[in-house]
Amino acid sequence: NPVVFLEQMLRIPSVSGQEGQVARFLVEQMQALGFHSYVDGAGNAVGAIGTGPEIVLLGHIDTVPGVVPVRIAEGKLYGRGSVDAKGPFATFVAAAARMLAGGELRARLVLVGAVEEEAASSKGAHYVVDRYAPAACVIGEPSGWDRLTLGYKGRLLVEGRWEQPMAHSAGRDLAVAEHAVGFWNAVAAHCAGYNAGKAQLFEQLLPSLRTIASGSDGLTDWAALTIGIRLPLDIDPDALADELAQMGMGGQLRFRGGCPAYRGDKNNPLVRAFLKSVRAAGGTPGFLLKTGTSDMNVVGPTWRCPILAYGPGDSSLDHTPDEHVDLAEYLRAIDVLAGALQQLGATLS
C-alpha cells in the first residue's frame, strides 16, 4: 500500500546526518518487494532491479528539522518530508515495485535514497556521482504530478566574522556590527547590479541574509553573519567568492557549499517519455526551473545524461509547518512515473 508505506517513512525522523533508521527501513521494504537492496558506504538506501540500460532514480531521505505531526486529513498526508522529499522517493519505490511485479521492466533501475541533501555537503550525491554512469536520471523532488523540473540554480554560502577592540558607542569609528551590515549591503548591491535588466529569477543572483548576530565579552566586540546566494547558469561559485572577498570590510570570510547552476535539455527520450505519460494520465505537462538547489546540481555535470526532477507535491510547502502531500496526486504521480519508465526502457533498449 503506497499510502501506508509513505506514512511509515514519515513517522521515522531523519534530519540530515541522522538518516540511519529510515535507510534501514527502506532497505527492508525494498528487499521484501524483490529489490537487491543495501545501505551503501555513505549511508544511502539503495535498491536495484532489472537488467539493461541503467536508469538512476536519485531521491533523498533526509529532511530539515521541525516536527510536523503525521496525520491524514481531507485526503492529505501531513508530515515532515511528505513533500521534500520522502514523498517523491516513495513514488520511486512504488512505481518500480509495480513494474517489477507486472513484468514490465526493460531497464535496470537503481533507486538511491540519498543522505544529507538538505545539508551543504550533499554527501549522498557526491558518493554516487563516480559510481554510476546512467543512461538517464530522475531526481526525486516535488514538481507536481504534471510538471517536470529541468533545472536548479547554483548556490554559494558566505560566513563572515568581524572583531575589534571594544570602544565607546559615542566614538567616531564604525561599530563592528556596522561592518557586518556594510558587507551585507555591498553583497546585495553587487547582486542588484548584476540583475539589472534580467527579468527571470532563474537568471538572477538571489542573496538572502540567513543569520546575523553581534556581541561583546567586555574587551572585544564581534559580529557574525551568514549569507546564502542562489546563482544563475553563468556565475561560477569560485569566481563569485573571489569577487566578494574584496568587499570583506576587514572581516574573516569563509565560503562553502558552492555548486554551479544546472539546466537539463528537454529534447531527449526521458523528457518525451514523461510528456507522453502525463498526457496519458489526463494532464497537460509543463516545465519548471527552480530557484533552489538539488542533487541534480551535483550529478548532472558529471553524468551528462538526460535528467529531470519529478515528484508529487507543492514545493511552496517545503520546510513549512504545514507540509503535506495530496494523496490523489501522490498516487497519480506513481502512475505517471511507472508509465514514463516503461516507455523509456522500451526506447533505450
Question: For each predicted feature, which ranges?
Answer:
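Acidic/histidine-rich catalytic neighborhood of metal-dependent amide-processing enzymes
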Residues: 90-153, 349
